[in-house]
C-alpha cells in the first residue's frame, strides 16, 4: 500500500482519564517502534493521535508524534459515541496541533455534515463504512435527505432515488424496482444502492474540493442538516 498506519489503541466512550492515558502512551510507544523498525522508503507512514476526549492527552500525544518523522498524521478515537458536539470540539482542537504541511486523516468519521466540518478544520482524508452499511440496510443518501427504500410508499414509485443524481442506479432504475429487489432479498439491491451512496459521497467530496479551490464551502450546512435531520422522506 502507499500508506501504512502505525498500531494504536482506541478507547471506547466514555473512558476514564487513566484508561485514556494508558492507551495514549501505548500508542506513542508503538509509534516510536514503528519508526525504529521501518524498512520501506517507498511507503508513507502515518501516526495516530489518541487521547479520548481529553484535550491535555491529545496535546501530549500530538506533541510526541509530531517530533517524529512521519509523513502524515491521523486522528483516531472519535465517532465512537461521544456525540456530535464533542466530536467536533475534539476534532477541531486536535487538528490545530498538527503540522499544515502534511496530510491530516480523520479516522472513522463519515457523515456528510461531519466531513464538511472536518474539511473546514484542515482534514484531508476520511474513511467510514456509512455509505456501504446504509446501502445494505436500504438507507440511501439524496439531495433532499435520507430515503428508506424499504417503505411501502415506494412500491409503485417510478421516480429514481434522487432526481438530481446521475449515477447508474438513478439513471436506469426506479424506487419501486429497488424496493422490490430489497424486500425480496436480491443481492442486486445492495449492489445498486451501494453504487448510489458512494456516488453521492463522490459528489460531496467533489464539491468540497471545488470549494477549497474557490476558497468557499459549496456543500452547505443547510443541506447537511437536511441530510442529517430528514426522517419522513
Regions found by a protein language model. Name each.
Residues 12-17, 21, 72-78, 187-190:
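Glycine- and acidic
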Residues 25-28, 37-161:
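Glycine-rich phosphate/ribose-binding loops and adjacent secondary-structure elements
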Residues 1, 39, 123, 186, ...:
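Residue-level recognition of short, well-ordered coil/turn positions
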Residues 8-14, 162-233:
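C-terminal extensions of enzymes
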Residues 28, 32, 88, 95, ...:
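Predominant activation on well-ordered alpha-helical scaffold segments within soluble catalytic domains
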Residues 32, 36-39, 96-99, 183, ...:
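Generic secondary-structure signature for well-ordered alpha-helical cores
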Residues 20-27, 58, 87, 171, ...:
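Generic structural signal for well-ordered, non-membrane alpha-helical segments
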Residues 1-39, 152-155:
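Non-catalytic, usually N-terminal nucleic-acid engagement modules in DNA/RNA processing proteins
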Amino acid at each position: 500500500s502507499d500508506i501504512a498506519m502505525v498500531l494504536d489503541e482506541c478507547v471506547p466512550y466514555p473512558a476514564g482519564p487513566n484508561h485514556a492515558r494508558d492507551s495514549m502512551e501505548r500508542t506513542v510507544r508503538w509509534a516510536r517502534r514503528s519508526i525504529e523498525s521501518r524498512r520501506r522508503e517507498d511507503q508513507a507512514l502515518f501516526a495516530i493521535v489518541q487521547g479520548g476526549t481529553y484535550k491535555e492527552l491529545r496535546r501530549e500525544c500530538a506533541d510526541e508524534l509530531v517530533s517524529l518523522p512521519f509523513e502524515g498524521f491521523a486522528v483516531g478515537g472519535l465517532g465512537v459515541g461521544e456525540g456530535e458536539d464533542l466530536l467536533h470540539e475534539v476534532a477541531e482542537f486536535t487538528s490545530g496541533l498538527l503540522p499544515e504541511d502534511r496530510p491530516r486523516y480523520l479516522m472513522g468519521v463519515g457523515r456528510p455534515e461531519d466531513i464538511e466540518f472536518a474539511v473546514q478544520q484542515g482534514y484531508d482524508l476520511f474513511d467510514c463504512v456509512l455509505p456501504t452499511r446504509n446501502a445494505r440496510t436500504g438507507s440511501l443518501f439524496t439531495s433532499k435527505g435520507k430515503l428508506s427504500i424499504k417503505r411501502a410508499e415506494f412500491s409503485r414509485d417510478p421516480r429514481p432515488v434522487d432526481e438530481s443524481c446521475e449515477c447508474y442506479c438513478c439513471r436506469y432504475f426506479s424506487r419501486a424496482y429497488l424496493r422490490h429487489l430489497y424486500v425480496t432479498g436480491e443481492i442486486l439491491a445492495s449492489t445498486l444502492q451501494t453504487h448510489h451512496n458512494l456516488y453521492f459521497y463522490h459528489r460531496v467530496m467533489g464539491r468540497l474540493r471545488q470549494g477549497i479551490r474557490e476558497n468557499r464551502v459549496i456543500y452547505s450546512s443547510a443541506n447537511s442538516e437536511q441530510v442529517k435531520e430528514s426522517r419522513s422522506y
